[in-house]
Amino acid sequence: MAFTACEKQTIGKIAQVLAKSPEAYGAECLARLFVTHPGSKSYFEYKDYSAAGAKVQVHGGKVIRAVVKAAEHVDDLHSHLETLALTHGKKLLVDPQNFPMLSECIIVTLATHLTEFSPDTHCAVDKLLSAICQELSSRYR
């Protein structure tokens, strides 16, 4: 998937925002996922699935840092995400349908926190997250 110069610039700005508080954004995204799609909890053994949960914050931080790193490699997502795709597809056996659900939660979280979340920004972020989902799903089983 090719990204325009404008999309890359927008994605870079959003990545900078996410990089400032990866645990906070990530925990909110995961907590939102667990509420809206309770079946996604089956991959995690947490006592507290809220954004305040320590394990939710740790894993949420990992997720957001991975998105930030992917944003830095938009021209070669396939190579950049290969190891992560293998881990989720072969070792953890995460159903690929979970990735778009989490992507929606990331977009909603961004939209609730950013004062400027224009349709163009939404489209650029959605395009990045869709490409990430596609790559992560490529090694399923």
UniProtKB/Swiss-Prot annotation:
A single cellular component GO annotation: hemoglobin complex
GO molecular function: haptoglobin binding; heme binding; metal ion binding; organic acid binding; oxygen binding; oxygen carrier activity; peroxidase activity
Keyword annotations: Heme, Iron, Metal-binding, Oxygen transport, Transport
Pfam families (alphabetical): Globin
GO biological process, one term: hydrogen peroxide catabolic process
Tissue specificity: Red blood cells.
UniProt keyword Transport, yes or no: yes
Every Globin domain range: 2-141
Chain sites annotated for binding O2: H59
Transmembrane recorded as keyword: no
Function: Involved in oxygen transport from gills to the various peripheral tissues.
Family: Belongs to the globin family.
Subunit record text: Heterotetramer of two alpha chains and two beta chains.
Name assigned to this protein: Hemoglobin subunit alpha
Originating organism: Mustelus griseus (Spotless smooth-hound)
Protein's gene: HBA
